[in-house]
UniProtKB/Swiss-Prot annotation:
Keywords: Arginine metabolism, Cytoplasm, Hydrolase
The species this protein was found in: Streptococcus pneumoniae (strain CGSP14)
Documented EC number(s): 3.5.3.6
Name of the featured protein: Arginine deiminase
One Pfam family matching this protein: ADI
Protein family (similarity comment): Belongs to the arginine deiminase family.
Catalytic residues (UniProt): C399 (amidino-cysteine intermediate)
Length: 409
């Protein structure tokens, strides 16, 4: 096994190390009037969400998996006063604060926080206007007056517990993503500092995509099927131009992959990422949401003579996967058993969003009873977790985890 700090050459190899984010005060800054702006449909109850998340983390530890936390890694990356100051300035610049006085007040507030992890968690939680000195009306600009009812000086980042999306581990490399929405793109700042300054990861990991790019890609659309084959989704959150940039970098940097299967499917919120409708659970088994199958287009992408070669695949999906994975047959396990009502309900509650921690061993929400029963009938071992509050953010076990190390398969 390589000593490289990032080692992810499959979706199913035994998981050794994973990064999570424990939901924090950012969830308490969700308001009904601004849910759409922050990409939420409902407001989780923080206390119960934390209990559910702690149980998820413990279930992973019980399987011998080392659990890292985004907030701790980011804090450990602020290794000098200069780097800490730089982090605060970048955070302020990306918060799009229009008023100079407000920016000065927030800078003072953040510099007043001496503990690095407390600082990181405060940047995640957002900053309410009531936390700052009040600006007299005569000193306010037009934007301040028009948006006087908006409660935040800096928006919270409530999606952070979905650590799968801001960056993705691919082989020994990382795709540091440019995300679909401004409210989530700020999340990638933490990954930037981890992979630039962290004592273990800083400067030791190649980037195959950079957050400075102007086209969008998210980790839920990046799946590592084997040491030779990747799958990427062309979705609501990831566009084809980003995928082409990613693939050119992967092939040029010799990260180790020979082919990419690009999945184009319905562009809407309920199917926001490939991993909300399609995940690998064993050497020869995948979960899939049946609603995407009719409109699914798959393209094979290779790199020849220093350019991408793209071929649309016309055959059966299971046969295509079997051929590319070198197995005799692939089983597609349909969410909800293919029943239109059960499939729609359980996909919405992330029945297709499984986290595989070893071949045939998956973490799932306990609430998706129809899909879970079928998975067990296929011989999989299920580690069931509660997700009544966590699921309100529209993400499951895979969404909530970013593997840093897997065993080879």
């Amino acid at each position: 096994m390589s000593s490289h700090p990032i080692q992810v050459f499959s979706e199913i190899g035994k998981l050794k190390k994973v990064m999570l984010h424990r939901p924090g005060k950012e969830l308490e800054n969700l308001l009904p009037d601004y849910l759409e702006r922050l990409l939420f449909d409902d407001i989780p109850f923080l206390e119960d969400a934390q209990k559910e998340h702690d149980a998820f983390a413990q279930a992973l530890r019980d399987e011998g998996i080392e659990v890292l936390y985004l907030e701790q890694l980011a804090a450990e990356s602020l290794t000098s006063p200069e780097i800490r100051d730089q982090f605060i300035e970048e955070y302020l610049d990306e918060a799009n604060i229009r008023d100079r006085q407000t920016k000065v007040a927030i800078r003072e507030l953040l510099h007043g926080i001496k503990d690095n992890q407390e600082l990181v968690e405060k940047t995640m939680a957002g900053i309410q206007k009531v936390e700052l000195p009040e600006i007299p009306d005569e000193a306010k600009d037009l934007t301040d007056l028009v948006e006087s009812d908006y409660p935040f000086a800096i928006d919270p980042m409530p999606n952070l517990y979905f650590t799968r999306d801001p960056f993705a581990t691919i082989g020994n490399a990382v795709s540091l993503n440019h995300m679909f929405a401004d409210t989530r793109n700020r999340e990638t700042l933490y990954g930037k500092y981890i992979f630039k300054y962290h004592p273990i990861y800083g400067g030791k990991v190649d980037l195959v995509y950079n957050r400075e790019e102007d086209t969008r890609i998210e980790g839920g659309d990046e799946l590592v099927l084997s040491k030779d084959v990747l799958a990427v989704g062309i979705s609501q959150r990831t566009d084809a131009a980003s995928i082409e940039k990613l693939l050119v970098n992967i092939f040029k940097k010799n990260v180790g992959f020979k082919k990419v299967l690009a999945f184009e499917f319905a562009n809407n919120r309920k199917f926001m990422h490939l991993d909300t409708v399609f995940t690998m659970v064993d050497y020869d088994k995948f979960t899939i949401h049946p609603e995407i199958e009719g409109d699914l287009h798959v393209y094979s992408v290779t790199y020849e003579n220093e350019k991408l070669k793209i071929v649309e695949e016309k055959g059966d999906l299971a046969e295509l996967l079997a051929q590319n994975l070198g197995v005799e047959k692939v089983h597609l396990i349909r969410c909800g058993g293919g029943n239109i009502v059960a499939a729609a309900r359980e996909q919405w509650n992330d029945g297709s969003n499984t986290l595989t921690i070893a071949p045939g061993v998956v973490v799932v929400y306990d609430r998706n009873t129809v899909t879970n029963k079928i998975l067990e009938e296929y011989g999989l071992r299920l580690i069931k977790i509660r997700g009544s509050e966590l699921v309100r953010g529209r993400g499951g076990p895979r969404c909530m985890s970013m593997p840093f190390e897997r065993e080879e398969v």
